[in-house]
Amino acid sequence: MLNSINTNPGALLALQNLNSTNTELAATQGRINTGKKVANAKDNGAIWSMAKMQSATASSLNSVKDSLQRGQSTIDVALAAGDTITDLLTKMKEKALAASDTSLNTASFNALKADFESLRDQLQKAATNAKFNGVSLADGSTTKLSFLANEDGSNFTVTAQTLSLTGIGLTATSTFTDAATAKTMIATITTSLQTATNKLSSLGTSSVGLDTHLTFVGKLQDSLDAGVGNLVDADLAKESAKLQSLQTKQQLGVQALSIANQTPQTILSLFKG
């Protein structure tokens, strides 16, 4: 190799190698500090863009889950009201059956009639109050409710099941006035009870479907989050090992540069003396 005091090829090469090591070391330290192998678009534009889109989809599913959970609660309230209503109908049937006994005296009959009418009014209140966040599937105020099903805005629709008096074949004045009408009311209440249980069965089916879809959305979100992690997260164990290797390489590079920088002094020493 030609020795010169004007240029020092060895020092230039050592400096280039050291700069390269420092750049790689800074990148490795950045990955360790952020935990990301792709922290921004300049790291890897295609991967960064893909990860951003997947992350946005996963984030938007939070709104879907919130909507579906509101749907769950709305159905649960309607089902709870339905349980109360079927219990009330059972008691109303008992009162009507007892009142159909022609051997009753007037006082006993009137007491049964009053109990029946009180149960009837309670039934209407149960249906009217079956609201979650001001929304009801049981009071007859709507025919269906739609909740978010996916991040594209598609819906999961639940058909309302009216459990108020009119929804199950009764009225606000349904009652009996004597043993004969009480006997007729037994059949009416039996039909109402069957109607109510059928409607509750439909709500139950909707509840199962909504729960299943909510579970799916949760799993989908977890999968998307994991996919984003696979795209951009750094392997910290690997990066830590690489960091130690680069730090050693950096130290050797500094020493190599120091040695190379001594070459001109060696040349000058040849002229001494």
UniProtKB/Swiss-Prot annotation:
Keywords, comma-separated and alphabetical: Bacterial flagellum, Secreted
Leader peptide range in chain numbering: none
Any one GO CC term of the record: extracellular region
InterPro entries recorded: Flagellin, Flagellin_C, Flagellin_N
Main location, first listed in the record: secreted
Gene Ontology molecular functions: structural molecule activity
Location of the protein in the cell: Secreted; Bacterial flagellum
Superkingdom of this protein's organism: Bacteria
UniProt subunit comment: In C.crescentus, the flagellar filament is composed of multiple flagellins of 29 kDa; 27 kDa and 25 kDa.
Role: Flagellin is the subunit protein which polymerizes to form the filaments of bacterial flagella.
Similarity remark: Belongs to the bacterial flagellin family.
PANTHER family for the chain: FLAGELLIN (PTHR42792:SF2)
Protein name per UniProt: Flagellin FljL
Originating organism: Caulobacter vibrioides (strain ATCC 19089 / CIP 103742 / CB 15) (Caulobacter crescentus)
Taxonomic lineage from the root: Bacteria, Pseudomonadati, Pseudomonadota, Alphaproteobacteria, Caulobacterales
Gene that this polypeptide is encoded by: fljL
